[in-house]
């Protein structure tokens, strides 16, 4: 079983992540994980923090000589701004006079609409929002991206599975339905300022971001995650919480600001008749072939062996520079919300986080299906399964 946890606050000393269940001999280390963290900082529309924020990665446990040991893994991502926050975010008691001179120590009593501020204050009995927003911040996703880098390495080395993402819409601007990006396109997508596969649409998206920035507003959008090389049979039909699509949807909805998820043609399927909504099958010399991929690579809660295709919708960032109306919880009076430093648009980065979450779910499902204490064992078990499908005439044909 694959298990992981993250800990840490946005302006605390560090984020920490632990994970248990990754087999031995996955070739992955600081270079590969740091590259994924770099990708998370990509994209037009990011705030000032991205220009100086450094993810100070340290591998604490479970690695040796560039590979995993099969032990629990532990990772630390240091906060390069910690010295500025050492007093305000100190874990131990701080005298009131020591806080008096710090602007950052001002009580945040005007909760921001769209954030966890007010609900968190109500739930955890805080008088201000700082204790809530620090953990609710999307900064936490850096830890999940680091773990996702390990899951990606395991998937590729054991099963040949590759996961990528691209931005398909940003605000009112949508990319046309064109050729689906594959892993060979990832470098080109990452080089694009909004991680859009269509260069013409990308320019329109950048213009929309700049217009939003000038108007003191924010933008949301939709990212698509694609997974290539999946075998049929990951997940299960037997219980709702074991269905692959349910697990992926839950993982993606767990990303800050994600408000919707769809697989394949998703909501468009509701506008078609059944005869035009499903993926017909036909026999070929290579096995059973589906003539379309409307389902997005899952049927009955299991992978079909086709390309997994899932989209996640990100709402506009809730920290709006021109400040939304709220209530000051100290006075009970109407007020404008606090403005914390934020992005205009973080949709390109959300795609990288979504890749990580999808990889973690797929790695867990792969280990449930094939097991293995080492990458070699997982690979051997998976190949035996594929050979058995072929012998029975049930292989998946591209």
UniProtKB/Swiss-Prot annotation:
Residue sites binding NADP(+) per the record: 40, 46
Does the keyword section mention Metal-binding? no
Q: Which residues form a coiled coil?
A: none
Q: Name one GO molecular function term.
A: FMN binding
Reaction(s) the record says it catalyses: 5-O-(1-carboxyvinyl)-3-phosphoshikimate = chorismate + phosphate
Residues bound to FMN: 135-137, 256-257, 300, 315-319, 341
NCBIfam families listed in its UniProt record: aroC, PRK05382.1
Per its record, how is this protein called by name? Answer: Chorismate synthase
According to its UniProt entry, this protein's organism is Cutibacterium acnes (strain DSM 16379 / KPA171202)
